[in-house]
Amino acid sequence: MAKYEDGVMYYFIINPASQSGRGYKIWKKIEQRLVRDGVEYQAYLTEYAGQATEYARKLTSHCKEARVIVVVGGDGTMNEVVDGIVSCDMVTLGYIPVGTGSDLARGLRLSRRPMRGLRRIFKARRIRQIDYGVIAYGDDVLRHRRFIVSAGIGLDAEVCQHMQRSAIKNICNRIHLRRLSYRILGFIQYLKAKPIRGYILLDGTRRVEFNYIYFISAQIQPCE
């Protein structure tokens, strides 16, 4: 295995439920390798939605030394971690994709093989800077949230929300037909959807109005 950097503590944030529970099995294999090679690490396994954000906030608040945080999970887990990071120039993110879609991994051309991803993190000689987006929402109280892949409202968000709790997703994943699950749920939600009127503001000045809006989506990565 590639030599890791001596004296560096690696903080792993893991979603064990990612990819229909495969995330936990992959993490145990990674952990065995870490123990075998004497890597200093701390592991934080999520148990509910939003906990990855809490872990990231806890790890990056008031940090005075370099922090290497490695995310083991899907796009949703990575989004939560990015949203939770407190402004700190000392934080470096690593990513081992274990998601159903892994759009971020495809966009960044990262390997889907966990051990290869671990080696890439340990032998990295340079740090890549990537963009993230920020959405503002709320009526009485304005809230902000970061995202690293995409953010949407309307039909696409409805499909994603139903996908999280749909039995169709798990069934299709087991038989390697992930795209089919999106098509089925997408078609169902399309039949239920009702377009609305609205507008977008470009660069804070130019207002563009639309009469039939099914969804609005902002993309950071080329894959979704």
Task: Locate the predicted segments by residue.
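Phosphate-binding core of ATP-grasp and ATP-grasp-like enzymes
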Residues: S217-E224
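Active-site-adjacent beta-strand anchor residues
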Residues: Q42-L45, V71, G94, V149
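Short amphipathic alpha-helical segments
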Residues: Y24-I26, V82-I85, R106-L108
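ATP/NTP phosphate-donor binding region
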Residues: M1-I69, N79, M115-L118
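Glycine-rich beta-strand-to-loop/alpha-helix junction loops that act as flexible
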Residues: P16, V72-G74, V98
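Short Gly/Thr/Asp-enriched flexible loops that form oxyanion-binding sites at enzyme active sites
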Residues: T77-D89
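Catalytic core of DAGKc-family lipid kinases
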Residues: S87-F215
